[in-house]
């Protein structure tokens, strides 16, 4: 069954028209101004929809802006408690609270609410989970061009280029698919990347990544303007993450890789293998585009046996 679209989501959400109108504007701003990924925006849409439904039951009627303005920390804790009772884990609850804080801050900036109540609620403590990195041998299998399963050469080259950017440069999948010809216009050994929140960083581009992208661009049948995304779907539209995720599923089956071998696992592998090769955390933080060093520090806990296996080698694709 297909997930509900935006119109159905509006019908499912319960709130006064003035609240729903502001919510639509806020969601649009997340994608257009803050450049959050489609996945994050969809998650925030679900979280706020569930919160409005909770408030409707809590207030015995669809909430108005005045009700949102009068929210207390206890109201938010009650919502989180209900979600926890329904089986939501700490990560889901933390993301939900982050979405509500974002919505309330948006309303506060527009003089429509007070976000202090959300700020007074602590985020659930997140369990430490270690990245599931591929071995260097597994990662190389994935990014090798002749391992791609697509019948058309340009699509096989496209898939190989995207996956090589994830592993060879540590990009998020959304960052790779947003790349334009202009992002490659600097030195041949560097790449301009626009990450979360619209923040730009310059990352080194190893030869294998540069060659993979160049091969794709030579084979791609579509004309691409300097400010347009370079990676295209079969019909010429911007390539969507789901296509690369499906390609990775096929590669997993063909190469006998574990279920943990996902596009994002290639980014984890980039960081893990660099750390094992002697890279320092601060540099890896900058390469990954992490706002906080604490986010990067999770790589120090990666299985020591895996690190020892590749200890004396630098990045395998360098």
Swiss-Prot record:
The Tyr recombinase domain extends over 129-312
Database matches in InterPro entries: CB, DNA_brk_join_enz, Integrase-like_cat_sf, Integrase_catalytic, Integrase_recombinase_N, Integrase_SAM-like_N, Tyrosine_recombinase_XerC/XerD, Tyrosine_recombinase_XerCD
Q: Where is the active site?
A: 172, 196, 264, 267, 290, 299 (o-(3'-phospho-dna)-tyrosine intermediate)
Q: Per UniProt, what is one GO molecular function of this protein?
A: DNA binding
List GO BP terms, alphabetically. Answer: cell division; chromosome segregation; DNA transposition
The alphabetical list of record keywords is: Cell cycle, Cell division, Chromosome partition, Cytoplasm, DNA integration, DNA recombination, DNA-binding
Q: In what residue span(s) does the Core-binding (CB) domain sit?
A: 17-108
Which Gene Ontology cellular component annotation is one that this UniProt entry carries?
cytoplasm
Q: Which domain of life is it from?
A: Bacteria
| Primary location | cytoplasm
Where is the protein situated, by its record's location annotation? Cytoplasm
Q: Which family does it belong to?
A: Belongs to the 'phage' integrase family. XerC subfamily.
Role according to the record: Site-specific tyrosine recombinase, which acts by catalyzing the cutting and rejoining of the recombining DNA molecules. The XerC-XerD complex is essential to convert dimers of the bacterial chromosome into monomers to permit their segregation at cell division. It also contributes to the segregational stability of plasmids.
Complex and partners: Forms a cyclic heterotetrameric complex composed of two molecules of XerC and two molecules of XerD.
What's the protein name? Tyrosine recombinase XerC
Supply the gene name: xerC
